[in-house]
């Protein structure tokens, strides 16, 4: 599960993903329930996408308040068709791209938590798969944009399976280590605008050589 990442500058996102300059944003660390930028299909321009600022932590349609008492910043891909918080966004095609310069994960191989930072080896930003929702407060009329980051089981991944604290009660093949899901630039349109089947085919683990990863400097 990812709980910390760094978003790019607005200008970098606009150039890389070819979105218009509609949302001012400075590069920043993003944490759960904090605001962050994401890209989604533009509802006014078919086959285009827009940059939106929303809360990292999806607010589902049935929520009574945007201040949730449970975590929705990550969504297991294996559960998105059944879990109440996410199945509506998936079924309605509310898929998004979460731009990131890097993301951090905890490594416990030394017996204590050492944060590792993950960048792309080619220097490009990450485009991480996510889901979004627009929630409206029925009392005040406030509109809240929000998003969640998809994760996939990474028990067999040579790099991502080294992250997070092992559960001593479970065997090595039952740890359910997780990885974010990168969407390559050439697949963005299929992810944002394609059929559920086409989008699901893009949910896969990235090869280890895609990553430039190591401990965060103290």
Task: Locate predicted features.
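C-terminal accessory segment of soluble enzyme catalytic cores
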Residues: 1, 13, 73, 155-218
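A contiguous pocket-lining binding segment that forms or flanks enzyme active sites
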Residues: 115-164
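Short Gly/aromatic-enriched secondary-structure transition segments
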Residues: 52-56, 111-120
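Conserved SET/PR-domain catalytic core that frames the SAM/AdoMet-binding pocket
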Residues: 84-110
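A residue-level signal for conserved active-site and pocket-lining positions in enzyme catalytic cores
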Residues: 2, 38, 98, 128, ...
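Extreme N-terminus nucleophile/cap motif
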Residues: 1-57, 196-201, 207-211
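A glycine-rich, hydrophobic loop/mini-helix early in the fold
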Residues: 48-90
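Residues immediately flanking
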Residues: 100-102, 152, 185-186
């Amino acid at each position: 599960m990812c709980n910390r990442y760094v978003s790019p500058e607005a200008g970098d996102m606009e150039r890389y993903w070819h979105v218009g300059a509609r949302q001012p944003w400075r590069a920043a660390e993003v944490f759960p329930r904090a605001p962050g930028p994401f890209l989604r299909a533009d509802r006014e321009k078919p086959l285009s996408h827009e940059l939106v600022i929303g809360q990292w932590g999806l607010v589902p349609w049935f929520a009574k308040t945007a201040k949730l008492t449970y975590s929705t910043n990550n969504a297991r891909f294996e559960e998105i068709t059944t879990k109440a918080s996410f199945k509506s966004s998936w079924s309605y095609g509310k898929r998004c791209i979460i731009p990131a310069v890097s993301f951090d994960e905890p490594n416990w191989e030394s017996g204590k938590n050492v944060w590792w930072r993950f960048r792309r080896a080619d220097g490009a930003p990450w485009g991480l798969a996510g889901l979004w929702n627009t929630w409206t407060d029925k009392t005040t009329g406030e509109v809240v944009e929000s998003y969640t980051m998809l994760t996939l089981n990474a028990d067999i991944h040579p790099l991502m399976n080294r992250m997070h604290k092992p559960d001593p009660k479970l065997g090595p093949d039952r740890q359910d280590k997780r990885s974010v899901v990168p969407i390559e630039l050439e697949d963005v349109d299929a992810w944002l605008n394609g059929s559920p089947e086409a989008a699901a085919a893009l949910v896969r683990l990235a090869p280890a050589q895609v990553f430039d990863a190591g401990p965060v400097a103290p």
